[in-house]
Amino acid sequence: MDLQAQLEELKTKTLETLQSLTGNHTKELQDLRVAVLGKKGSLTELLKGLKDLSNDLRPVVGKQVNEVRDLLTKAFEEQAKIVEAAKIQAQLDAESIDVTLPGRQMTLGHRHVLTQTSEEIEDIFLGMGFQIVDGFEVEKDYYNFERMNLPKDHPARDMQDTFYITEEILLRTHTSPVQARTLDQHDFSKGPLKMVSPGRVFRRDTDDATHSHQFHQIEGLVVGKNISMRDLKGTLEMIIKKMFGEERSIRLRPSYFPFTEPSVEVDVSCFKCGGKGCNVCKKTGWIEILGAGMVHPSVLEMSGVDAKEYSGFAFGLGQERIAMLRYGINDIRGFYQGDQRFSEQFN
């Protein structure tokens, strides 16, 4: 077969093969292009035969070769478009949407368990006549420590325990500074002060299952005339019963806080076992829940309140601890990791 006939045969067979390729034959199309038009393809092999032709025939066949190459190149380009279009259409068909189907129900958000706990606690205090007072998270050393009867050399002022921004500015380690500022402003001629101050506080703790460098506290303060330890105990009993049930009881253990004197740790009878002893209460029947005490006279005097005429009590509890006890949560880090699987349990 002469070279011209071979060129015609190559053109015809290639065009026929191209027509059979669809959207499922992208690789086959590329392989065919290389086999025909590639550097080692069929057309290149035929070109090698030009040297054996006569001088008269060589230009004629050379022109035919170029025409065949141009024709096949264009044919491959057109078929590639067809193959790609067919591929896209097949994908669209496979992913078609039935517009008559009902839409998916929108996922509803809900309050975080800490928000729920905080609101429940605040509602309890509002019902008892307390006012809610917010304060600064970035606080002065003076209000955070000195006004709370914490002298310069107190261990709690150590850099290991507190996030200092400057020597005089820090991230508050408790919400007590709000109480100091409120004491400065309160007009006792209009009645006693009853307040709680909820909010985030910060400590230089290593995060683990029971510790976090930030957590939430709610601290309470009552100051007026003839406020006694009996008032503190009665208030705490009412709070605990509203939080954990009317059958709960409390006990007070001696403790120490620089800003209260006397100071107590407050335990609640275990709501899991009813005081019989279990893993939650560590077999004691009691769970440590908060710290409290009578406001130290120095704290009152620094606010210009006559400690001989006025007295008061203060208490503080951690909202994470309350939530962990109420819902059986054993790792404080779950509150902050944003895992919806954790959060939706409390919806």
UniProtKB/Swiss-Prot annotation:
One of its GO terms (molecular function) is magnesium ion binding. It catalyses: tRNA(Phe) + L-phenylalanine + ATP = L-phenylalanyl-tRNA(Phe) + AMP + diphosphate + H(+). Its cofactor is Mg(2+). GO terms for cellular component: cytoplasm. Its main location: cytoplasm. One of its GO terms (biological process) is phenylalanyl-tRNA aminoacylation. It is an enzyme of class 6 (ligase). Binds 2 magnesium ions per tetramer. Keywords: Aminoacyl-tRNA synthetase, ATP-binding, Cytoplasm, Ligase, Magnesium, Metal-binding, Nucleotide-binding, Protein biosynthesis. CDD domains: PheRS_alpha_core (cd00496). The keyword Protein biosynthesis applies. Its EC number is 6.1.1.20. It is found in: Cytoplasm. It comes from the Bacteria. Tetramer of two alpha and two beta subunits. Belongs to the class-II aminoacyl-tRNA synthetase family. Phe-tRNA synthetase alpha subunit type 1 subfamily. NCBIfam families: pheS (TIGR00468). This is Phenylalanine--tRNA ligase alpha subunit. It comes from Streptococcus pyogenes serotype M18 (strain MGAS8232). The gene is pheS.
